[in-house]
Each structure stands twice: as C-alpha cells, then as structure tokens.
C-alpha cells in the first residue's frame, strides 16, 4: 500500500471512530425534559485560549504582531506581505468554537466596514461640486445644516435659575465695560488681526432683526461678507463675465459701518478671486475651462459659473489658510518661535487604540453662545476709536454717544443702512473715488492697509470698551438675554473648565470683582455676556498665549475653529487638487520654508503687486506691528530676510518692442544700466563678504568688464569648438541611450527633462569641476536632476524674478542652494590650489576626455591670475555656471518645439537629411535652422534701468524715459519684427546672423554665444538624425506654455502646479535604433 493510500486509510479510520464516539455519547444522554417540544437544550461551547494556541504557529503570531502594530501606530499595512490573507488563514484555522477566532473575525469585519464612510460624505455631480450661495448642501444628506436663514444652535443647556430682573444693560456697561484708560495689546498685535476677526464674525453671524433666533448668514467660513448670504446678493457682486467679481466690491453693507481697513481686506480677497479666475482660464487644466462663444448663452453661462465657483473655492481656501496659519498661530503666539506647528483641523486622522478619529465634513450650525464669544470691542485701537466716534457724529450730530437711547440708536442705524445703494459699486467707501474701470486707486488702498499694520490694537479685559460702543454693547446684552442662554459658569463647565467660586476668580481687580458682586450676588448667576469679556485676560506665553484674551474665550475660540473647518466639506474631503485644479491648490498652500507656514503674503502681493517688495514685512507678518516683528525676527535670526521699508509704488516697466530700439538700448551702456547686481550679490554673499559685485553681469563698471574678459579667455581656448562639438555629440547620444525606452515597441524619451536639460548640466559640471554624481563619478554630491534644479533656480532668481507673489520663496531657495553648491565648489578649488597631486585626483573624478582644456585645468588657469579662491568661486565661477545651464537648455527646447509643431515640421525631413550628411556645409545649415527655430520661439526679455533722461523711438512712437525708470527690452517681439526679419513667421536660412536677438546684444551679450551655437546645433544634429521624429501623442508631447506680459512665454511644471520660466517636459518619438556611442 502506498504512503498516500495509508494516509487515506488512517484518515477514514479516524473519521469512523469519531462518528462511533458521537453515537455512544448520544445513547448515554438522558431524555429531554427541559423543553416542551421534546428537543435538547444545547449550550455553545467556547474553547479557551490554551486550546486555541494549539492551532496557532509562529507565522500566526507574526500576523497578530503586524496587525497590532498597525492598529497602535496607524502605520500602513504592506499588502504585498499578504497580511489580509494571513488574517483569513488564522481565523479559518481556529476552531469554530474559538472565542479568539470570533473576536478576530469581528475585528476584521469592523475594519472592512470602517474602510468606507457610512453614509458617504463626498459626492460627484455638479450639485455637490460647488458651494451654494446660502451655504446649504454642505452636508449632502442634511442640506439645511448651516444654511443661511436657519436658527442658531444652542451649545449649553441652561439649568441655573436666574432672576427675571437682571441688571440694566447700560448700567452693566458703565460698571464693567466702559474704557477708563487705553492699554496697548501686550504682544503688540496689530489691528489687522482684528479686521480678520471682524470678517470671520460677520461671515458666521448676522442675526435677523425680525427674528433674533435666525442667522441670515451661513455657518461656514465661506467669505459671505464678500460673496453674499444668498443667491440674490451673490448675483449682485458678480459680473457674469469670465467668472469675475465686480472690481473692488464686497457684498455686505454692514462692513461699511466699520473702519475702512476691514473693507480693504475684503477688497484684497476680491482681487485675489479675480486673479485666480484669470489664471484658471489661462491654464485651462485638462480643458476644464475651455471658453465657448459668448453667443452660445448656455455654454458661456456654464463657463462663467465654473470659473466663478472654482475661484470662490480657491479664495475661501486661502482665507482659511490665513485663519489657521497666520491668525491662529498669532493667537497662540507660535509666530514668536521657529516652529512650523499649527492647529490645523484638516489633519488626516485614523481610528487608533487611543480613540476614534474626529469626524469631518458633517456640516456645522453656529451656536448663539459663540455669537457672544467674538465681541472684542475692548481691543479697538485709539485710531479706530476716533474713526467710530467721527462716524457717530455723522449719524447723530451733536449728541453724546454715551447718552443716546437704544431706540434712537436703532433708528439712526436703520436710516444709515436704508441710504446705502443696493448696487455694491455705488456704495460710498472711505471717501474714495472709483476709476473708469470701477476699481479704486491702489495708492489709497495701500495707505489704509499700511496704517492698519502699524496700528497697535488694544488689550482684552474689563473696563476697556470705548464708550462710543455703549449702545451696541447694551443691545448685545439684551440680545443674549432674549436667547435664554446658559450662565458664564455653565458655559465654562461645558468645556470642562472649573467654574468660578468667587468674583475675584472672575476678575482679580477689586473694583471689578466688587461691581460683579453688587450686580449678581453670586458667581453662578453671572451671565455669559458680559461675563466672558470681563474675566481676567491671560498673560503672554510663547508659544501658547498670544491673543491674551479672557480665559474662557481663549478655550472656546479654538473649539469653534476646529468645528468650523473640520465640519466643512469644502475645507476637508473636497479640498483637493481635483476640485481646485493643481495650480490653484498649490498656489494657496503654505510652505514650511517660508514664514514658518504663514500665508498672508499671498493675499497682499496678489492684491497690490506694484507696491510691496517680495520680502516686505508688511506683507509677510501684518498681524503684528513692524516694530515688534523686528524684535521677534531678530531673536529668531531671520530679520535680515525681510525689507522693513514702508510700501512704495513701483511703476511697471516700460516694454520696448522693436528690434532697432532694443539693439540701440542694449548697446548703450551709459544711458541704460543692467539691473542684476543686487540679485547676484544677494546670492553670492558669503561669510559677510560682498562677493558677486564684480561679476560681468552685475554692473557696468570696469571690474565687470574685466570679469567678462577673464571668463572669456578661460572658456574660449584653442580647439574649444572641436572639443565642445565632440562633447555634445557624445553626451546627447549617451543620454538618449540612458533615458529612452519603448512603449508598445515605439521609441520615446522626454527630450526636455532628460536630454536638453541634462546635457547642459554635464557640460557645466565638466567645465567648472562641479560635484555631479554620475556612474563614472559616484562620489559626486548632486544628481543630474538636482544640479539642474539648482542652476535653474539660481538663473530664475537673478534673471526671471518677475512674479512678485513667488519672489521671496524663490530668492530664499536660490540663496540656500547657491550657498550649498558654492561651499562644495570652493572646497574643490582650494584643493586644486593647494596640491597638484590632489588636483590630478580631482581631475580624474571629474574628467571628460573630450574636454581636456576644461575642468581642473580651467580652474588652475583662473587661480594663476592670483585671485583668491573664494573670489574665483563666488564672483566668477558660480554666476557664470548659473547663467549657462537653464538658458542653453531652454533655447534648444524652444527651437526643437518649433520644428515639432504643425508649421515647423515641414522642415524636419531636410533637418534629418542634413544631420546625416556630417559635413561642414550641412552643419552650417543646421546652425541656421537652430537659430531660426530659437528666434521664432524666443522667450527672452532683458531689463535695464534708465541712467539719464532720454527719448527712444519704438515702432514709430517717441517714448520719453525718465531717470530711474525700468524698461524691458522685449526680444520676443524684437525677434519677430518684420522690419528686421521679413516674413518673421517663416524659416529663412539666409538671414543675417548678426541680427539674431535671443542671445542679447552689446557689451552684455551672452558670453557663451559661440559656445551655445556650437553646442545646441550639435544637439539638434543628433536629435534631428532620428527617423520620423515626432511628438508623443497628447499633452505629453507638447510644451505647456502660456502667453505672459509682452507675449513672453510662461511654462508650467509637469504636474501644472506652478509656472516656470523654462520648458520642463516634452516627449518625442522616433523610428529605428539609436546609433552607438563612440567612446
């Protein structure tokens, strides 16, 4: 009998014995007498842990450990380790009577259930895609929650028996609130923080005068003071054209009763919205905002609405980021530290051993108690107190505000509001006059904002509300009573705060404590309002206590902030790049490396791009007065990163467009000066030494000319042309072999990212002995991609710093990487200077046989001049290298892009033929093809500053230029000037080579002109040799570019999250095999 048969027989025998055992057991049972139907009562037997362990092996124990570890830490499970399947095996392997097996199965079922929302909280469809005007539909299943026109919620159950005869509201004001003397805020918080608070308050609370239980605004942070509380109000603020709002308008009338600074902040959000929708339409991500003909009414209405609604989501997203990253961080005094921590309710949470994750996107309904929490009149500055007193004199001429009866006060407010026009553009604002386009003059708005930043707010506490607010506070007390709310102590207990046992605990000032005692008799009877604003204020603590508000308020506002944000679907589960677009989502995100994640500057610089420097302290930290910010940032060691100058208008540069005018300006070094010196010095300054000032492009002085002469001699050696040509042919082919691949049998490569950009990186590293990590130099520091990014950032910071909203971030990043690269390069140069042995060793690490005259040899030639190594590196090598890589790469990519276009592709067969000829004549024609492609796709613009008054003729017009005026020589338009280039849209190979403008002109013409022409023509030759060269299908085969000012191209990153001055990606395809690399 075989082993298999024996096993089968034994198994059968075991089964038979088990059956016999069951029969015997059944025969020994007593008759069933416990049931009426004659059946036995059975008990489910549960096996114990010892019996279960007999079914568990080491693999099962490992499964339990892995699952427990994930539950404890929240760490994701690696499904490639088959943990789910192992759990199933373990559960299935335990006896059916196993209690552990049952618990394990139930846990598994619970996990699977909890994987999905029940019910779902995010939905598809246009109805759920955007915020509704009245806030309804935030919770799709309970759409009324938080909608405008619904009742306030009640948070705290009022159980305390209170006297029906409570103290007179005006007496309460006089006893507890009236300002005796002004006290500045202890942390020197500016009034801007309280203007943001005013917007938040009026975003969430607007009590219906006819029914005080109703709030006329939504319960969400949706910027309703700007956009309106309902569809009718929202329609009044919209232009219904291209998704835009009416310029410099806001919906609410109530803000006009506040100092104009509040309205200015709303106008800034208005401008940000209009900026966003312009960019959304321009980028048109995935064809989402393709503009139809306006005659197609329905299609255009959809286009306009999609832009408007998406722009609103984005603007509200920035608004909430300002609240969480600027406002709340300042409230908690984290702005005084170098921490990037923030109390962000959008944090991703998962259930764990310590409890369930907080729910999100549930909706929100504001509570009446919180309507009272945010009444912060004690913090009104002396400046704003004066403004309010002046306004009262307009409303109630000759009357003392403290003596106005409540009835007269309400009638006066009613008359004032009734006079305000319904049309937002017609309402008076701060005495300003609108311009023809409906906007206000930037100078006026900036002046108001600037003064707001410098205006220190008042302190929290009793006896600090200006008397002009007597009637308003009395109305607030009456309103609170009409809501029948809980007492101060009940409100504190709700937040698990100890109730006050004595009046001195409420306020340690003997006078205030005594007044409370006379008014309320017992601490338990003190009303929530004014109780919460007469408590002692917290002391400053960094981090922890920055607002220094009353004790109960400091706790309540944090709970409210979490509820408002985490409960809002559009700020949580639907706050995604898919809803906002990749660019817009990235545009409003905080950066860890900028301002410790503060984002207010994003609003300021988009609203007033011509008044603030990119590093202005007024833009970056406006919630604290500048003088206090100076102390804070000096202590943190970052004060020198910012400009402390007051905002000042800088006119946009004058564009010069004709070829003749551009060439004339670029040739006139006396009248027109270069502007890059301060940028170069900023990046190159090292160990407090002002390096970079004498670099060739830093100025128009003699040392700058000498720098150009020195670097020119170093670059253009004997046989340079032969060496450069051989290098580029070799490296281009090598990169093609390394980075190309086949998709379904078709050759493909990203010709921009992996060929054009990296070829320049390799050349630059070889020429200047930079620490590039490659297969032949594994001990290098930077990868090809990293070194390209460094060089691109440096070049952008110096020559393309045109986006004021990104300027600070760009320049700080550029300085950081420049310093890092510079120190490594300096160490290398100093080694070469000290010893020939090490120099030879370094040379072997960086050597490229083709470039025998460069690398270590070139560094040695520079050292032979007697110049110190730091001066060589920081003033000459780094700026030259930084100006080379990205510029050369973009010129090649732009030229190739033209020849891959529909109009340019007719030339590809001839380029292919010439590339294969490999003759001097063919190479000369390829150079002309390259120059024409680069001319047609040029995106070069060169700035100059006018040194002395002059007149320039540009396209037949006389332009008067003033001293100090900034101009832009637009080489895009100059390169397409039909006077210089007849039929400019066509490729002509007989044009005068001296007229091409894309390398600049005059004494600051690109030093690498000759080198570039040779290098990039060689690259065109290698790529052009590929058969049936063509774009990859779809968007991947095209450069994503938009037309900026003056027609200058703006490119985008591959994921379209940001603009970039250079091409970033474009994939090409071809037929046949690549030629072998000739070593």
UniProtKB/Swiss-Prot annotation:
Region feature 9,12-octadecadienoate 8-hydroperoxide 8R-isomerase, mapped onto this chain: 654-1079
Residue positions of the active site: 374
Segments crossing the lipid bilayer: none
Keyword hit for Isomerase: yes
Gene3D superfamilies (UniProt xref): Cytochrome P450, Haem peroxidase domain superfamily, animal type
Gene Ontology MF term list: dioxygenase activity; heme binding; iron ion binding; isomerase activity; linoleate 8R-lipoxygenase activity; monooxygenase activity; oxidoreductase activity, acting on paired donors, with incorporation or reduction of molecular oxygen; peroxidase activity
Biological process annotations from GO: oxylipin biosynthetic process; prostaglandin biosynthetic process; response to oxidative stress
Stretches for region Linoleate 8R-lipoxygenase: 105-446
Catalyzed chemical reaction(s): (9Z,12Z)-octadecadienoate + O2 = (8R,9Z,12Z)-8-hydroperoxyoctadeca-9,12-dienoate; (8R,9Z,12Z)-8-hydroperoxyoctadeca-9,12-dienoate = (5S,8R,9Z,12Z)-5,8-dihydroxyoctadeca-9,12-dienoate
Assembly and interaction partners: Homotetramer.
Membership in a protein family: Belongs to the peroxidase family.
Name of the protein described by the UniProt record: Psi-producing oxygenase A
Species per Swiss-Prot/TrEMBL record: Aspergillus fumigatus (strain ATCC MYA-4609 / CBS 101355 / FGSC A1100 / Af293)
